[in-house]
Regions:
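Beta-propeller domains
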Residues: 1-303
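N-proximal low-complexity "stem/linker" segments adjacent to membrane-targeting elements
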Residues: 303-333
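Short, aromatic/basic amphipathic alpha-helical patches
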Residues: 359-374, 392-394, 627
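Active-site-proximal specificity loops/subdomain of glycosyltransferases
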Residues: 371-433
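GT-A fold catalytic core of metal-dependent nucleotide-sugar glycosyltransferases
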Residues: 415, 419-472
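Catalytic core and acceptor-binding pocket of nucleotide-sugar-dependent glycosyltransferases
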Residues: 448-454, 464-467, 471-472, 476-477, ...
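Amphipathic alpha-helical repeat scaffolds of TPR domains
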Residues: 564-574, 589, 601-614, 625-629, ...
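Alpha-helical repeat scaffolds
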Residues: 585-591, 621-638, 642-647, 673
């Protein structure tokens, strides 16, 4: 059995409530089933239920008065940001309540198992407010140390564990039951059954509700549910209120030796998740955990081919800026472009979007129409909560003092810079979540096919993503002046629209990018993401495996050149001009397949020439076999012009060729090399 990983366990020890029991002994109430709420400012309220009975492992219990009685302690205090939840400094008082409804005879007295709806509204079980004296759900208001204004919720039958959640339409609902899976509004009898798969239905048999639901993003709510066997087992339940789908975690327990575990509350405070839990009906705790540890218990999507996950995002920053200039493409055009390529790819895809229902629907429907929902994860994330958004005011300041000479300040706005930098925040979040259990990841701009051509080449390389960061180099950064001086202009050295790598290398790239960004901001300048990537590459070349071309070939050129061979040879010549033979050799090896398929291309002579220069230093004094084959094919060509050109090339490089140990493989009928 899985024991859930916990960041912290906070015991709740309350002042004892003593009484003379029915055996004429001094006895005391025992604490159990706490409820918890923390507001945005860190104000904490813990309600601890105390009872006059003790439950045993064999399900029997001992009652110490004639009837079961339940009393609540109200514990209040405050938590600051990342500080430990220290309830020893909190205030403890007995909770007061005032019924405004008739009281009926019941074996159970008092309030039971409170669940917070929000800071001032609760759901509570009160048998003595039910005509039959049975457990019954009521809604009530809580203010300070007092609960009032009780009202019945319908249908008022024994479904004890309703789970409230915010429905995103300015109202609250509850999960009323799990099997069948039914939701409803809080007070009205408007049950709505949601159809689930048979597999999911079977997993929910015997399960009951536990906690309220916390908001993970606009459409996803996280709950805890439980089942009582010989001991209590739990599952996390993730409910998508947009698609009416649920995902269940593996079963687990919180503690190794407990036999009863009852959770009433979940709280998400500053991305710290707290669970209130009663153990064995005689102990109360608060557990702190995090979403990363929770999501680890969810089964990963079936990815038998170990396909990489493609990561992308779509945020309408121009609407945030109220910017309607023609220079900036509208969101609709990005979606139109993506429907022709990215959104129809049959590979694992995670898309980060803002809290925008139209965007969500457009993406969801496009993937649904393509029957690709199983390979789709839509991650709703407020742009203001992303990692690089914290730099907004700093970028406004930097743009006043540091000017990119060929930049367009109306286009490269602070939000634009933040948006592109946030590729790495999306990468970090995806690796943390890893919904498709991938070992490798690909960043791909959402509207990449606006510039990319021959994009179907992705089907050739999607299974061949290397561990190293594979990224397009357009213009090698060989210049020797300081980065701050050099990057007063945008040079598009590296293309930021597509790059890939293993988990570890993508995490490392993200860390290096974040550090470099902080470094240049602290040096009072900034640049767009591609320039920062270029600097990271220059300082960490071992981390990268470059491919070459221009934006036109950003998808197609991944394995070998398809487009831009002319530009690629400008890059190789630039390397040579700076005496970077290793980089030139690597580029030429990347081009080998191109010339295998295009031996009559005019650039083949540049290819041969540069290999003659670089192979000696980078291939153990041996000309590459494919280079020798190309030389010999030109020597024996039926095209006189090719014969003349290769003869001139070899004559001009006679001295260099003499140093190669395999020069004898060159077929020269007219001269010995």
């Amino acid at each position: 059995m899985i024991i859930f990983q916990k960041k912290d366990v906070i015991p709740i020890i309350i002042p004892q409530i003593c009484f003379n029991d029915k055996y004429d002994n001094i006895n005391n109430y025992v604490e159990m089933n706490p409820s918890l709420f923390i507001d945005e400012k860190g104000n904490v309220r813990i309600l601890v239920r105390c009872v006059n009975y003790k439950k045993l492992p064999d399900k029997h219990f001992t009652l110490y008065e004639s009837k079961s009685n339940s009393i609540y302690y109200n514990i209040t205090g405050i938590i600051h940001d990342s500080d430990k939840l220290d309830i020893e400094t909190f205030d403890y008082t007995i909770l007061d309540y005032e019924y405004n409804l008739p009281i009926f005879p019941s074996y159970w007295r008092g309030l039971e198992d409170i669940r917070f709806i929000d800071a001032n509204n609760i759901l509570v079980i009160i048998p003595e407010l039910n005509e039959g004296g049975n457990p019954s759900i009521l809604k009530a208001e809580i203010n300070n140390n007092r609960i009032t204004h009780f009202c019945h919720c319908k249908p008022n039958i024994v479904e004890k564990n309703w789970m409230p959640y915010f429905n995103n339409t300015n109202n609250y609902k509850v999960i009323y039951s799990l099997h069948p899976f039914i939701i409803k509004s809080i007070e009205n009898d408007d049950l709505q059954e949601i159809e689930l798969s048979e597999t999911t239905k079977n997993k929910l048999v015997g399960y009951h509700g536990s906690t309220n639901g916390i908001t993970i993003n606009k459409y996803e709510r996280l709950f805890l549910i439980h089942i009582n066997r010989n001991i209590t087992h739990h599952r996390w339940l993730l409910f998508n209120i947009k698609t009416n789908t649920i995902t269940l975690s593996e079963e687990f327990v919180f503690f190794k030796n407990s036999y009863i575990e009852f959770t009433c509350s979940l709280v998400n405070y500053n991305n710290r998740i707290f669970v209130s839990i009663g153990v064995n009906d005689n102990k109360a705790f608060i557990i702190e955990t995090c979403y990363t540890d929770i999501i680890e218990l969810f089964p990963k999507c079936n990815n038998e081919e170990n396909l990489p996950t493609i990561i992308t995002m779509l945020y309408d920053i121009r609407s945030m800026e109220n910017n309607t200039t023609e220079r900036n493409r509208k969101l609709e055009s990005y979606i139109d472009f993506s429907c022709k390529f990215l959104l129809k790819l049959p590979f694992p895809l995670i898309i980060f979007i803002d809290d925008n229902e139209e965007t969500y629907d457009a993406i969801y429907n496009a993937r649904k129409d393509a029957n690709l929902l199983d390979n789709t994860y839509i991650y709703v994330c407020d742009f203001k909560s992303t990692y690089f958004y914290k730099h907004l005011s700093r970028l406004h300041e930097l743009q006043q003092s540091f000017h990119i000479l060929n930049g367009e300040i109306e286009h490269e706005t602070p939000l634009y810079v933040i948006l592109n930098n946030n590729k790495f925040d999306c990468i970090d979040r995806t690796i943390q979540l890893n919904p498709f259990n991938s070992s490798h990841f690909i960043w791909m701009d959402f509207g990449i096919n606006h510039v990319a051509q021959s994009t179907d080449y992705i089907y050739e390389w999607i299974h061949k993503v290397p561990d190293k960061i594979k990224q397009l180099c357009i213009n090698p950064y060989t210049e020797t002046n300081s980065p701050k001086t050099h990057f007063q202009c945008i040079y598009h050295n590296m293309a930021g629209g597509l790059f890939s790598g293993s988990i570890e290398n993508m995490k490392k790239y993200s860390e290096l990018f974040k550090n470099k960004t902080e470094e240049i901001y602290n040096d009072n300048w900034y640049q767009i993401d591609e320039a920062v990537m270029t600097m990271v590459h220059r300082e960490n070349p071992h981390l990268f495996e470059l491919y070459y071309g221009d934006y036109r070939g950003i998808v197609s050129n991944y394995l070998y050149p398809v487009h831009n061979i002319d530009l690629i040879f400008k890059s190789s010549q630039k390397y040579l001009d700076y005496n970077k033979t290793k980089e030139t050799h690597s580029l030429l090896c990347y081009c080998a397949k191109y010339f295998e398929m295009n031996p009559h291309c005019d650039f083949v002579f540049y290819y041969i020439q540069q290999n003659i220069i670089t192979n000696y230093y980078n291939n153990n004094r041996l000309l590459l076999p494919n280079v020798i084959n190309l030389i010999n094919s030109k020597i024996n060509s039926d095209i006189e012009h090719d014969k003349e050109r290769i003869h001139i090339l070899l004559e001009n490089n006679r001295t260099n060729i003499e140093y190669y140990e395999n020069k004898a493989l060159i077929l020269l009928p007219a001269a010995k090399m």
